[in-house]
């Protein structure tokens, strides 16, 4: 059985000036607790539903014009970790992503991840590789659009 755990909800901010702490939370994943099969990848030996978890954030830094979201596994045995999600150009008016969100319907974009696909790619660590940490980060950005694809 694969040990699939999410143990870190990380938050990084690129905009300075908020009087309050920019905070990321989720109803679907909790630090130090196993992730549900819903958030496991469908493929590469895993048979999850491959849905992104619900995420919400508050106390957005002043001057934020858009957001980016990343999900990263620093414990993947690749030498450089494993990127599970890269979403960007999410409008500043958005402060919550529902489970299984279609980023394009919000006006955002998603980039290629380490599975070789675009969009969210759930957890799927190699068998007998121990626990993995999945770091979800919301980036508050000072520009409306990034010149990325």
Can you say where each PLM-predicted feature lies in the sequence?
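Bacterial N-terminal signal peptides that target proteins for export
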Residues: 1-8
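N-terminus-centered regions that define maturation/targeting leaders and the start
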Residues: 20-149
């Amino acid at each position: 059985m694969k040990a699939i755990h999410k143990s870190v909800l990380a938050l990084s901010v690129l905009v300075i000036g908020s009087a309050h702490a920019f905070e990321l939370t989720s109803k679907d994943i909790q630090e130090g607790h196993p992730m549900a099969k819903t958030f496991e990848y469908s493929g590469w030996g895993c048979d999850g539903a491959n849905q992104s978890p619900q995420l919400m954030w508050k106390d957005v830094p002043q001057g934020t014009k858009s957001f980016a979201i990343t999900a990263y596994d620093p414990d993947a045995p690749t030498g450089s970790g494993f990127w599970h999600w890269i979403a960007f150009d999410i409008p500043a008016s958005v402060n919550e992503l529902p489970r299984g969100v279609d980023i394009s319907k919000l006006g955002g974009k998603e980039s290629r991840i380490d599975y070789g696909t675009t969009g969210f790619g759930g957890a799927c660590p190699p068998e007998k590789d121990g626990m993995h940490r999945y770091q979800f980060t919301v980036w508050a950005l000072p520009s409306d659009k990034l010149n990325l694809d």
